[in-house]
């Protein structure tokens, strides 16, 4: 057995003790300060009453917190990598126009293969395209998460991407589309970084499915692509005892 198991060997949905530190937008450094609770996965609008915060409507509070393993993929070297997602929303945003830019600060150089950066060729403080290390949850992530749930990936809507998959538009109480799976169905409102006929796509906790046309202050959920070398050093993967992690270049196998 492995004395230090890989994070990519852990179950989907496991909680991970991850702290964001920041990255860079072009040459500009952005940080997730130690005093900002969102860096450790504490939800927007959290309070001291034991609830997990909300965006848009206090009636729909998130049911979970921290960071979780959302799905796995193989890299070009055929090594599995774990993709983390914030368990709920780390901040509330008014639109998705700069969602990938806002996600940059939730990176951590210790756990990714890249440099936690995005290009900003015109130096306007906005990512020209998403970083390869961290981004706002999008249609490709939805496909990967729903594939982990049912074995068959789904896309958000017919118009949100060119993915060859059944879409989840106007589909309710469908486990294949995330219903009752708290990686997606997490109690609160949040945006997907995708559009359908120029309409925003979001998770609607009132119907527990995706919806479109909403505007206003909904949640941002960063996705982080972890290095294949990240190992588990402790914890049991639950919300109260998340896996603690380290990035080791060499994994020692015990016979």
Task: List the predicted regions and their residue ranges.
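Collagenous Gly-X-Y triple-helix signature in extracellular proteins
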Residues: 1-255
């Amino acid at each position: 057995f492995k004395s230090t198991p890989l994070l990519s060997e852990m179950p989907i949905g496991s909680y991970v003790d991850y702290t964001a530190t920041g990255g860079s937008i072009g040459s500009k450094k952005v940080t997730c300060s130690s005093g900002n609770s969102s860096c450790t996965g504490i939800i927007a609008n959290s309070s001291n009453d034991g609830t997990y915060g909300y965006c848009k409507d206090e009636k729909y509070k998130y049911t979970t917190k921290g960071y979780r393993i959302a799905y796995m993929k193989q890299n070009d070297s055929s090594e599995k990598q774990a993709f983390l997602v914030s368990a709920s929303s780390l901040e509330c945003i008014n639109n998705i126009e700069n969602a990938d830019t806002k996600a940059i600060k939730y990176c951590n150089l210790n756990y990714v293969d890249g440099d936690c950066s995005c290009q900003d060729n015109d130096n306007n403080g906005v990512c020209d395209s998403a970083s390869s290390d961290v981004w706002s949850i999008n249609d490709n992530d939805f496909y990967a998460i729903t594939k982990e749930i049912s074995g068959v990936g789904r896309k958000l809507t017919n118009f949100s991407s060119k993915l060859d998959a059944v879409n989840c538009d106007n589909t309710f109480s469908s486990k294949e589309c995330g219903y009752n799976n708290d990686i997606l169905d997490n109690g609160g409102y949040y945006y997907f970084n995708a559009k359908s006929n120029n309409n925003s796509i979001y998770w609607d906790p009132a119907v527990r499915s995706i919806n479109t046309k909403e505007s206003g202050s909904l949640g941002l959920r960063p996705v982080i692509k972890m290095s294949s070398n990240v190992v588990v050093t402790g914890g049991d993967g639950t919300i109260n005892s998340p896996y603690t992690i380290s990035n080791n270049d060499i994994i020692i196998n015990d016979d």
